[in-house]
């Protein structure tokens, strides 16, 4: 009866999801909009005990739609329009129309048929894994991003040993909570007063998992895909020729710790799978911090920063030299904790250290690493193939909340009187001359790559989310518009721009692309940058409004799986896998250009995260991490020598000043 009622009320996936579109923060779907209200007091083993089982909604999540081909072509051409002159656009339009009625029609039909056969997943999941795992470039800078933790509000708890101990304990508690099915499901609440309540949870837990999603939907709550979570722990990317593999072995009870490029392991769980005493974790970490062993002349971790095929060959040589057991301990460890000896001076120093560091005190292949500097500055650096940061951000939020609200050790805590010298093992590796030469070469390659990277940050203090919302403008749209204006001011052109948007509202959803550069942003940027004084305040406000409305539409479409990028990507992947001649749309220089993302952007706001960052995705690009806060807007931007990041940020700041001047009703000159 209930199933029938629910399914008749929720017959169309896309209409079910339309309410999601009202939220401006959809590009990250972060946990900041949800409070976890399940019962605490879960003892030292669990963070909390959710009333609703963690994976209760997973089975009934809606499937990621394959967009209609005509919609994809229309959206593709709309995104190409501001990037091309009339002649180029006319050619691209012709190729797109040929594709729609010819090769594209066939590929689309095959993709839809394939998708119907694989109802347990999404059409993008396998090709997306394949894309990441087949990439041969170094994962450092090219793929791994970082998100840094805010400091503990209690300064004395930022001591490196105290914070490391608390983070390890909270991380293990998170893992245990997740594996016991007691972690609160990831749900996006549009009406928390109705859906984020114990009474609703007690009701929904009895709705069968096959239809539970619909029950949540009826109270405007949207469960999100949690299929990536199982790769958080005991997981590593293993280098292989042509295509890497992901290894997850949840039998591992040990933690991997790195200091001065040396690798240590100790069991963080006892034989019964319980967290060892926090005082014992503290004792073992203290022992590692005080270990006088000097920095390794041949730090093995730097090999994980190499070209993937090069690393594959060297890994085989490591195995041949008798290092199999030590490598297995690295690969199956719960996660990696990197204890750095540097004190970090400022945001820029933090970004460089957490994004890449010196290459020696990292194992970049681990699913994630918690990095802790000498002064207690902390961050997560994560390998990107297994997930999109949705699981990592949830983990980071929970760990920050747990370590700051319920720390298990403090500045006055005494480490346990245990024999850490027998509990902690420093891994020894047998290295022949060939391996030593490989490590030396990897160090050189690493230094050459990171020495080209510049990072700069900017804080705009004259306004933020609150003021923009009062003016009925999308905060994300205005931030993206400022990047378009900034680039136009600096370089005089409009270029391919990428904004990541989560499709976690669907089963095995990954991301879709929002294309922030539009005919609207181009017109508005020209008015502000190249024609100041030629437009009235009312006209400029009208242009801002148009940009905001259109960006909101693009965001809604992307979050509902209605972009064009993933659909075109999947059809291209299908053509390649069949050995088909590549359709002419994909050979169009304009297709290459729109996928050469000079502005690669991603937004993040969370109470746990102070800043996030990543390198540009192309040599002549910018990597733009940003957050629109209540009263201010922050950007953390990277570039290579082809671009001037300092000047770019000055231009973005000037753009924001102009926008807020107009919002105050004043003209710009």
UniProtKB/Swiss-Prot annotation:
Designated name of the protein: Carnitine O-palmitoyltransferase 2, mitochondrial
EC nos: 2.3.1.21
Organism, scientific name: Danio rerio
Class of the enzyme per the UniProt entry, highest EC level: transferase
Swiss-Prot/TrEMBL keywords: Acyltransferase, Fatty acid metabolism, Lipid metabolism, Membrane, Mitochondrion, Mitochondrion inner membrane, Transferase, Transit peptide, Transport
PANTHER family associated with the record: CARNITINE O-ACYLTRANSFERASE, CARNITINE O-PALMITOYLTRANSFERASE 2, MITOCHONDRIAL
Record-linked Pfam families: Carn_acyltransf
Entry keyword 4Fe-4S: no
């Amino acid at each position: 009866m209930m199933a029938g009622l629910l399914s008749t009320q929720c017959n169309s996936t896309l209409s079910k999801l339309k309410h999601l579109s009202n939220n401006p923060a959809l590009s990250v779907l972060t946990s900041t909009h949800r409070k976890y209200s399940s019962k605490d007091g879960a003892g030292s083993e669990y963070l909390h005990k959710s009333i609703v089982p963690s994976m209760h909604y997973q089975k009934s999540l809606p499937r990621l739609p394959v967009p209609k081909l005509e919609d994809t072509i229309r959206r593709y051409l709309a995104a190409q329009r501001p990037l091309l002159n009339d002649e180029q656009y006319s050619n691209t339009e012709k190729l797109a129309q040929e594709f729609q009625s010819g090769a594209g029609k066939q590929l689309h039909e095959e993709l839809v048929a394939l998708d119907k056969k694989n109802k347990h997943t999404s059409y993008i999941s396998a090709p997306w894994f394949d894309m990441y795992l087949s990439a041969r470039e170094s994962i450092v800078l090219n793929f791994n991003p970082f998100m840094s933790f805010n400091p503990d509000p209690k300064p004395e708890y930022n001591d490196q040993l105290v914070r490391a101990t608390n983070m390890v304990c909270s991380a293990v508690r998170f893992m245990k909570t997740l594996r016991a099915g007691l972690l609160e499901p990831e749900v996006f609440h549009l009406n928390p007063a109705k859906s984020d309540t114990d009474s609703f949870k007690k009701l929904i837990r009895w709705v069968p998992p096959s239809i539970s999603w619909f029950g949540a939907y009826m109270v405007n709550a949207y469960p999100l895909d949690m299929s990536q979570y199982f790769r958080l722990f005991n997981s590593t990317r293993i280098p292989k020729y042509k295509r890497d593999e992901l290894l997850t072995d949840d039998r591992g009870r040990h933690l991997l710790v790195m200091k001065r490029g040396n690798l240590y392991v100790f069991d963080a769980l006892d034989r019964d799978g319980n967290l060892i005493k926090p005082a014992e974790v503290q004792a073992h970490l203290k022992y590692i911090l005080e270990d006088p062993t000097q920095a390794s002349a041949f730090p093995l971790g730097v090999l994980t920063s190499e070209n993937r095929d090069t690393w594959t060959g060297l890994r085989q040589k490591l195995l041949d030299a008798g290092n199999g057991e030590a490598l297995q301990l690295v690969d199956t460890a719960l996660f990696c904790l990197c204890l750095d000896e540097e004190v970090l001076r400022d945001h820029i120093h933090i970004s460089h250290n957490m994004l890449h560091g010196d290459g020696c005190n990292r194992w970049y292949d681990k699913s994630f690493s918690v990095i802790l500097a000498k002064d207690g500055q902390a961050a997560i650096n994560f390998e990107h193939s297994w997930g999109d940061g949705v699981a990592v951000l949830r983990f980071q939020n929970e760990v920050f909340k747990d370590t700051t609200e319920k720390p298990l050790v403090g500045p006055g805590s005494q480490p346990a009187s245990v024999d850490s010298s027998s509990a902690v093992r420093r891994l020894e590796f047998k290295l022949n001359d060939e391996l030593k030469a490989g490590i030396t070469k990897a160090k050189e390659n690493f230094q050459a790559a990171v020495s080209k990277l510049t990072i700069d940050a900017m804080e705009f203090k004259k306004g933020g989310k609150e003021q923009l919302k009062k003016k009925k403008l999308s905060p994300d749209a205005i931030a993206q518009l400022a990047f378009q204006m900034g680039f136009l001011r600096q370089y005089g052109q409009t270029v391919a721009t990428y904004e990541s948007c989560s499709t976690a509202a669907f089963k095995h959803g990954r991301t879709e692309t929002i294309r922030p550069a539009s005919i609207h942003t181009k017109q508005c940027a020209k008015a502000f940058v190249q024609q100041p004084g030629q437009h009235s305040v009312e006209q400029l406000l009208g242009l801002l409004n148009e940009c905001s409305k259109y960006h909101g539409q693009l965001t809604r479409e992307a979050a509902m799986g209605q972009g064009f990028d993933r659909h075109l990507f999947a059809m291209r992947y299908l053509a390649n896998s069949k050995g088909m001649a590549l359709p002419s749309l994909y050979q169009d220089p304009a297709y290459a250009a729109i996928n050469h993302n000079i502005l690669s952007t991603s937004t993040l706001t969370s109470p746990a995260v102070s800043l996030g960052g990543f390198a540009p995705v192309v040599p002549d690009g910018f990597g733009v991490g940003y957050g629109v806060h209540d009263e201010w807007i922050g950007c953390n931007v990277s570039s290579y020598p082809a671009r001037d990041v300092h000047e770019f940020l000055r231009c973005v700041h000037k753009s924001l000043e102009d926008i807020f001047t107009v919002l105050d009703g004043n003209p710009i000159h």
